[in-house]
A protein has these predicted regions:
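Active-site loop/oxyanion-hole signature of alpha/beta-hydrolase fold enzymes
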Residues: 16-26, 49, 53, 62-107, ...
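Flexible "cap/lid" loop of the alpha/beta hydrolase fold
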Residues: 126-164
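Short beta-strand/loop motif that positions the catalytic acidic residue
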Residues: 238, 244-246
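Conserved alpha/beta-hydrolase catalytic His-Asp/Glu region
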Residues: 163-234
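Catalytic histidine-centered segment of alpha/beta-hydrolase-like enzymes
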Residues: 252, 276-286
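Acidic catalytic loop of the alpha/beta-hydrolase fold
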Residues: 225-226, 249-253
Length: 321
């Protein structure tokens, strides 16, 4: 993984005011379809290092760290869903004159859906990997429900976050993988090391716990009450091609939610990966990449063409004169 040009060699703040401070250029041909990967709650660009090399033979892949996540400090910016959707939009405008394909996992899938609804011209297509979808309480795993409730109680959520952050980074990563994966041992050792490195760097940031608490409350408010119906309306307004990938063993967003979304949006392509949890791009990168590349050649072909810089140049009006 290489650092994108918005990152100074000394690791200082990014050079683009109002845009993400840290992002990764994961490779791929300059003329290939642009895929921008959007991580989930508490995640980072590292969430994509396993699957990206399997896509960069034909696609250009970038992955930003959203505000309050990864190595992008909030610095007074909001870390909730709406704020990071706006941040993503500015990032897209800064890296490409034309539309991109957004690939979002969990909260990143939600933010990608909202961006496609708010700015359809900026999004050629969506690849949703176990996205945060509208949920009813009965659909949730009891343990997951209990954790979410804790974060909604004033003071308790921050205390839980503070306790987690006192653990060594390796233990934090292991705990997240146990929750998010059906079989954590499937995640490659070098990928785990990269996540530990990011958390070790993030441990030096001030306000990281408050940033996470604000983000998780925002996600819960969007998928549940009071925002669920508004979120559903935004989802139904999305007109671009959509690939919905979902692990059948996901405890955070059950596969029944994905099946419901696919029924309600018949133009979407649903691909279930059996026996995999909430992060297929980490737990089953080969299967995930196979589904993505197949979609890009078939139902997502128009999205791939629209996201390719060469096509964007052809579509741009000729200069007068």
């Amino acid at each position: 993984m290489t650092a994108g040009p918005a990152i100074r060699p000394d690791g200082g703040p990014g050079t683009q005011p109002g845009v993400v401070s840290r992002w990764a250029d994961l490779g791929g041909p300059a003329g290939g379809p642009l895929i921008v990967c959007v991580h989930g709650l508490g995640g980072s660009a590292a969430n994509w290092v396993a699957v990206a090399p399997l896509l960069t033979g034909s696609c250009r892949v970038l992955a930003p760290d959203l505000a309050g996540h990864g190595l992008t400090q909030s610095r007074g910016r909001g870390t909730g869903v709406a704020a990071n959707r706006a941040l993503l939009h500015r990032f897209l405008a800064s890296v490409s004159p034309g539309p991109a394909i957004l690939m979002g996992n969990s909260m990143g899938g939600m933010i990608s859906l909202l961006e496609a609804s708010a700015h359809p011209g900026a999004v050629a297509g969506l690849i949703l990997v176990d996205p945060a979808l509208p949920l009813l309480p009965a659909q949730l795993d009891p343990l997951v429900t209990a954790v979410f409730v804790l974060y909604l109680i004033p003071g308790i959520g921050r205390a839980v976050t503070a306790r987690q952050r006192r653990q060594p980074p390796a233990r934090q990563v292991a705990g997240v993988l146990r929750l998010c994966c059906a079989e954590p041992s499937r995640v490659a050792a070098d990928v785990i090391t990269r996540h530990v490195q990011v958390l070790a760097q993030r441990a030096r940031f001030t306000g990281a716990g408050q940033d996470f608490s604000a983000a998780i409350r925002s996600v819960i408010a969007t998928v549940g009450c009071p925002g669920r119906r508004a979120y559903q309306r935004r989802i139904h307004s999305v007109a671009c091609p959509v690939l919905l990938i979902h692990g059948t063993g996901d405890r955070l967003v059950p596969v029944t939610a994905a099946r419901t979304a696919a029924r309600q949006n018949p133009g979407w392509t649903l691909a279930e990966i059996t026996g995999v949890g909430h992060v297929p791009q980490l737990e089953a990168p080969v299967s995930t990449a196979r589904v993505i590349t197949g979609w890009l050649r078939a139902a997502g072909r128009t999205a791939a063409e629209a996201a390719a810089p060469g096509r964007q140049e052809q579509a741009r009006p000729a200069a007068a004169g």
